[in-house]
Amino acid sequence: MVFPWNIAKSAEEAFSRWAVKRVVKFLLKKKLGKLILGDIDLDQLDIQLRDGTIQLSDLAINVDYLNDKFDAPLVIKEGSIGSLLVKMPWKTNGCQVEVDELELVLAPRLESNKSSSNEASTSASTREDLHNIRLEIGKHENEMLMNAAKSASIDVHEGVKTVAKIVKWFLTSFHVKIKNLIIAFDPDFGKKQSEAGPRPTLVLRMTEIECGISEEQVSANEVSPDNFLGINRLANCVKFQGAVVELLNMDDDDDGDKTCDKKTSNDVTLIMTGVGGGFSGSLNFSIPWKNGSLDIRKVDADISIDPVEVRFQPSTIRWFLQLWKTFTSFGSDCFPSVSHSDFLTDSPTIPTNVMVTPPATLSLSGGQELEHDTTPNLQFIPDWFPSSFSKKEEDGEVDIGASVDQFFECFDAMRSYQSASGSQGMWNWTSSVFTAINAASSLASGSLLLPSEQQHVETSCKVSFAGVSVVLFFQDEVNWKGVSTRIHYLGAELRDISVSFQVCLHDLRLEGEVNSMEIADYCQGGNVVDTANAESQTCLIKDLQAKVQTSLPPFASSDMHSDSERLSEIVSDGFLFRNKGFAVKTLLVIAAGGSGFQFTVNFQSSKASHRGSNSFSLSLPPTTFWLNLHSVEMLVNLFNDVSESIPITSHERNQVASSSKSESLRGSVSICNARVILWFPFESISERFCNSLGQQFIVVDLSSSPPSDKERAKERSPGEMHFPSATRSICFSVGDASIYLVTSDLKDSETNSYHRQVEFSAYNILHTNNKTRHQLSTIGMFWQDRPTVSPWLVERAKMLATQEESIQTDKSGGRGLEFAAVATPKDQDDIYSRSRKEIILASSFCLYVHLLPLAIHLDSWQYSKLCNLIEEAKNWLSRMAANTAEQTEESVVCQTSLVVDCDSIDILVRPEPRMGIKKQLQTELPGSWIQFNLRVQKLNLMSVPNLGSVSGADFFWLAHGEGTLLGSVTGLPDQELLLLSCNNSAIKRGNGGGSNALSSRFAGLDFLHLQEPGICNDYLAVSARGCTISAVGGRLDWIEVATSFFSFEDEKKTQEINSSSSSGSSFILNFVDVGLSYEPHHENTDHLRQASDPWVACLVAASSFSLSKKSLVDSIRNDYRIRIQDLGLLLSVDFDLSKLGGTYSSEHLHESGYVKVANDSLIEAILRTNSENGLLWELECSKSHLVIETCSDTTSGLIRLATQLQQLLAPDLEESAVHLQTRWDSIQQANARNDLDISDRLSSSDSSGEMKYLRLESENETGVIGLMDEINEDAFQFDVNPTYQSDSVECQNNYMSPHGISHGQAYNWVPATEKLPSNQSICGSSSRINSESSQVFLERESLPEIFENYCLSEFRPSSEVPQEGDSSGRELFPETDLRRGNSGWYDDASLRIVEDHVSEATEEDHEEHILDGECSSFGQTSYSAVAANGRILLKNIDLKWRIYSGSDWHDSRKKGENFKHTKGRDTTSCLELELSGVQFLYETFPIGEICTSKLSLMVQDFYLYDRSDNAPWTLVLGYYNSKDHPRDSSSYAFKLELKAVRPDPETPLEENRLRVALLPILLHLHQSQLDFLISFFGANSLEKPVVSMGDSGGSTMSVSVQGHNIIEEALLPYFQKFDIWPVNVRVDYSPHHVDIAALTGGKYAELVNLVPWKGIELQLKHVHAAGIYGWGNVCETILGEWLEDVSQNQIHQLLKGIPTVRSLSALYAAALKLVSSPVESYRKDRRLVKGVQRGTVAFLRSISLEAVGLGVHLAAGAHDILLRAEYIFASSPSLPQPQGRTKTNVRHNQPRNAKQGMLKACESIGDGIGKTASALVRTPLKKYQRGDGAGSAFATVVQGVPTAAIAPASACARAVHSALVGIRNSLDPEHKKESMEKYLGPDKQRKQDQHR
């Protein structure tokens, strides 16, 4: 204590009580007069000097003065003090002030905008003037101060020092205690609020609050320059208790008589309270001393608050939102001075120091000279004592009164100075206390200098809460006052909260920690029943949650339950105003353990940088979330309800958005251990009172080890690289993540049986694998302030989705090119990458997710459950979104994006095993698919709503890198089979050659979807690179199993999709380097084959495969365009899955033994669904060129591959096994009864070519009859003509053509075997009939009666079977073209086949139909009573098959040798089969109809070429075109039609009907070519030839099908009937040598090689048969019929092939013509001379041709002999012998006429003379000139004599041959054409004709 007690005694004795009151009143009036309203009455003042107390009572506060001084956004409306007691320090340690019943009423400062703006402008102008004046004064006073400091020293008066010490001690020992503090806040929202009812007022009540200032003393050894008088820090302590925050409903008629504390409880809404009716706390505030003054740059504060309870209800939330809106709307009017003060403070023109000096007459002593540079930041106190002094003062006597007055004058001057320098408002009152302490300290130390106003540097504050409880009611208090009302609320409990923040000049750092947290859902019932069951229901819920937790793996927060039991239960029951019930508690969130919640926040103001930068980090403790979406829904509804009452305008929203965008934000959240449990169904558990507890849960587990600070500093979020321009971002870091599906064992019928003990099972369906433990999965949210509006992004995305750029590249490349531009793939990759970046940068918000390697495990049951739960959650979200959308107004459309990156993903699904799989499909790989495993790398996902800020433009992008799909079957559960691979090794594979220019850089898949607004178009594009699909064991049913697993059936959704077809769509599927591999799996099929049988695998590879579709609006028709570039087929023998190992590169395929056997450069097709012609689907392909290249072994491999696929794709015979055997037995019994084998009867025919019907005689027999009894053998006639014109033509050449019935066309008719009129005999039919006569009209009136029934033959009586002698005349009706489905086998009198397939008469029946098979008619709609539902149409297909000698596979391949070192094929020996203009049609018909399918095949031209280097000629097989066999340009060389019918639709038996027609064939065969064909097809390179089931013939071996023994032949295709129409064949055979050894050994076929065979013309008869099993039997029947007919009827045609016989036959025919022509001419027109002339000319021409032909052959033979002799004798180097051939074939370049022949003859003679001269002169002369000598030259002459002698003879022979060939070509142009086509080929011959 500074003063002793005697001072108080002397003061009491010196002054009287009245004087003391007067003095105290004077002092209080002087210092507190402005704070107190009115004058102080002496009756209100009580002074006890002995006790040291001064007391005032009933004081009113001058609110106007305070409001003017504070200048705050809040104003004090009224205030009062019940009692003010001041205790002097002589009985207490320091000065104490006690205030009782302090009441303040606050209100917002609500000035009008106009007045505020005027005042602001006036204040600004006034302050600017004052500021300028102050600057001028400051300059003048600075000069005076500098002069005074230099001239004299200053000494502070001792009296002032004494007063300063007293004041300093008083201020540092000041204590204030306030009891019963009430602060009310009346927001005064306006008239509308007051008119609506009571006005809520926010009230803060405190029982007691105490504030004191003290000094922290330090020891002597700790005294430093920063300490002052041993004082280290100035401490300020504030303590309060009993604090309560509440809302009072104040009425307008309330006055001062009705104070706040007199309100009833019904008018009070409690907001914040504590355990004992209020909360308490303390605030410790300290400031350090530095250089004798307070260092306010560093302030430390420590706040501690006891447990607090915060309560909210809708009305209070609504009130606070309205309050916030009011403050924000008037914020600009509340801070005009603050903004101006900041302006002045920041102004650079303000001087840093303002110095003032006392008058110059002042006498200072003891002072020291001050230098400017040593005290730059100090200020003098101006005018701190008056200018005149008394003598006593000059003598040093202390005048205390004068010293007091002088001190307070200095204090007022200091306050005035600070007010003038800009310190105004609330801070002026706060900082003046510290400034006064500084002033007192300076004066007490004898210093006249005051420190300048210090800038704040750092403030440290620590706030700790023992606990915080938050209660949120979903209803207002007025709604649950009734006893029976149910109360529903949420309670949150937070324990041990510690928050510390550090405020610097431009930065703010906030750190906090929360030890534990619990959030629960409470529901308290109002009736007695609910109250009685509440406790048991709470236990049931806890038991349920405990069982769910037990079913899950151990979690880090499993020990939190013990902590939660210790949490306070104040939020459950104790706080309620009525304690009549117990609330049912449902735990929602519990977080405890570890280091708790830890968060750090850093704020950097915009003054420190160009843009303020804020950051925060949050670390979560082990947390468990029980997410009940019903509670979330209630929260959302509460928010919507509250927001309705306080709508936010768009202007306010824009202001908030603009203010929030001024600073950047970076946040990071680290989730170490968290468990989220989603509760299903979405109902409030507490409201339902556990009648039906949750049965299904989705649990998400997140766990990771928190990274260290160094690792966190080094880490950079991957999202920041994708979104560098983001101004605000929040990143969540997660380590390992797992998702579980938890289900109960309750059945649906036991749902409400909650009393039963329920057990739960957890299934891990998703988890991440953090192998390194250093990497974390991240979830980032990024915001951008001003994203660029880019509507052009929609067009860019449309280009990507439609792949327009790649299509344009293909078009620019031109048709027929195998490869496109090389730069296209790289450019496309660049476009994808650039577009992805542009889309991300144009987003205002981006959610980025980066996942570690992810694994998903699901079975079908789990997936269905998960889909149901997700669907329920989606419905909930859509409902909530709809409710929220109704409350919100439209805002600006902004683009947002979701980006997901995953390092790898592993999806394992287990579908249910399927039953009823085809047994044939399981031939190689038995079992059902039970598991699929999909593994992909680098998964990227992007979802962008409102792309380019265009409303409704949604874009989705999914991409991944390499990947594989593995599968397992029940037969091999432990073995995974590769089903699909997407590998970089397959890049550039193309068609297997490894040179695909369309390849991309990396393998992968891209899935793009764009929904374009406005026109409502959907664009979908799927692109895959390096993809190979595997059909292990020939099974591709895994595609259906996999897709059906993920197809979640929803009938309503399907109906909605089907009904919403009003929008157009576009779909593109594009594959690059795609392949389809068939890999036989023969591990378990050894019993089906012998060990020596090899297996063949194949791979169909393509450089590019694209499928595109565009759907029109309101159209069900879809057209899919298919485009395949560079297609190849590769084969491999003895295939083993271990060879490939999942690698399908071209190099590895070649090493594994794959050989390319077929390729096609371009294939274009169209697949139509729901087409206009009534077809469900239709596939059309045109203009394709297929090239097949094989050797003998690969050809056998193709055959074996077809056999393997046939066994896999064969129909299931289990259902039809009994019917197959019954059909076989019926036919065999019928054959036995008739004692006639079917094959013998089919081969019978008469000499005229008529065919007899195959009928089974059964007149007197009963029983089972053959199925073919009722088949009319002429039912398959191609064309008929009702009228026949006679002409004298040979019978063997009579047939009818489809177009004009001309010779040479395919036969479209069947010769009638019934009795025909004489004018319709076959032999007398015309060979040339006009096309008009061939047109047949089918009139409606002429239709016979149609029987629409069909009876199986075994159930029909024998009387109905037609008899053999039934010869009733019948009309011939034409059948439609190959695509028509109309067909009928009926007669006017009797119906032979009575089937339901006869069509009704249609409009087309009135039109004429010509059965010509033209291309124009091929492919038209089928007009049948039952239309086809599917169709495959191939048009203008070109096929080339090249067969080479050699082998593609080495013979020692089984020894493990590398296929890379095989010998390979010999390309010098090659035959090529060319089919051009191929038309193919296949139609399917609906199930239940008689006709099941129809196949039609037509070939425009077919040729067989010899492409060998030593080929004797080019054309081997072709069309026989001659004057006797003319051909129409539109006719086809080959026609085939195959129909599959089902006589009984209810019986699964199909029977085939076949008909084939051929144009005349020309065969030029050389012996070498025949040997090549025999060696190629006769010797199978594979170990054992495939024995076709059709080759078994009459085998009686049986197989077992479903326990039934069935003959193997009965399983073969059954041909109800087939027709092979007559065909003419012209054969030329040139032998090369005769195998004498084989001939002598009995091989008499060598006799054919003795002589050449020329011009053999054979007419192969029409073959008609019925009831044949197998293709092998069909071929045997056809060949047998033909051989028998040729051997019996056309042996003379073979003899004509001998050249001598042919010449004699020609001379005989010419001589006969010479005699018969005059006779015929005379008989016809009585002109004999003309006939003689014709006969003579014909005779002479025939003799000339034979003579010339003989000469040609002789000359050619002589030339060949002489040429060989010339090569033998030639020794000159100038005449080398050819390596492959011994002669030049002159026939390849034969003269076209006699003139050209003579020219070539002259050239030949000249060449011969030149050779002679060269041998005798030129060659010896060259040797002589080189210096060989005369002897050597003479020897050369002797050696050249034979050559010189033979060369002219050889040249003459060649000249004669050329001349004769020219003459023959002039006389016989037809032979010339045939010869040129033979040696040059048809194509080259046509080109030469065009050039000439």
From Swiss-Prot:
All copies of the Chorein N-terminal domain together span: 21-129
Q: Decide whether keyword Transport is in the record.
A: yes
Q: Which UniProt keywords apply?
A: Autophagy, Endoplasmic reticulum, Lipid transport, Membrane, Plant defense, Protein transport, Stress response, Transport
Q: Which portions of the sequence form the region Disordered? A: 1357-1376, 1866-1892
Where found?
Answer: Preautophagosomal structure membrane; Endoplasmic reticulum membrane
Q: What's in the GO CC field?
A: endoplasmic reticulum membrane; phagophore assembly site membrane
Respond yes or no to whether keyword Plastid is given for this record.
no
- Please write the reaction equations for the catalytic activity of this protein: a 1,2-diacyl-sn-glycero-3-phospho-L-serine(in) = a 1,2-diacyl-sn-glycero-3-phospho-L-serine(out); a 1,2-diacyl-sn-glycero-3-phosphoethanolamine(in) = a 1,2-diacyl-sn-glycero-3-phosphoethanolamine(out)
A Pfam family matched in the record: ATG2_CAD
Q: Which GO terms describe its biological process?
A: autophagosome assembly; defense response to bacterium; defense response to fungus; leaf senescence; lipid transport; protein transport
- Membrane-topology descriptor: Peripheral membrane protein
Consequences of knocking out this gene: Early senescence phenotype. Defects in autophagosome formation. Enhanced resistance to powdery mildew (Golovinomyces cichoracearum) and mildew-induced cell death. Constitutive expression of defense-related genes. Increased number of peroxisomes and accumulation of peroxisomal proteins. Reduced sensitivity to programmed cell death (PCD) induced by both hydroxyurea and the bacterial avirulent factor avrRpm1.
- Segments of skewed composition (Basic and acidic residues): 1367-1376, 1867-1892
Q: Which InterPro entries does its entry note?
A: ATG2
Q: What is this protein for, i.e. what is its function?
A: Lipid transfer protein involved in autophagosome assembly. Tethers the edge of the isolation membrane (IM) to the endoplasmic reticulum (ER) and mediates direct lipid transfer from ER to IM for IM expansion. Binds to the ER exit site (ERES), which is the membrane source for autophagosome formation, and extracts phospholipids from the membrane source to the IM for membrane expansion. Plays an essential role in plant nutrient recycling. Involved in the negative regulation of plant defense responses to biotrophic pathogens.
Tell me the protein family, please: Belongs to the ATG2 family.
State what protein this is by name.
Autophagy-related protein 2
- Gene name tied to this protein: ATG2
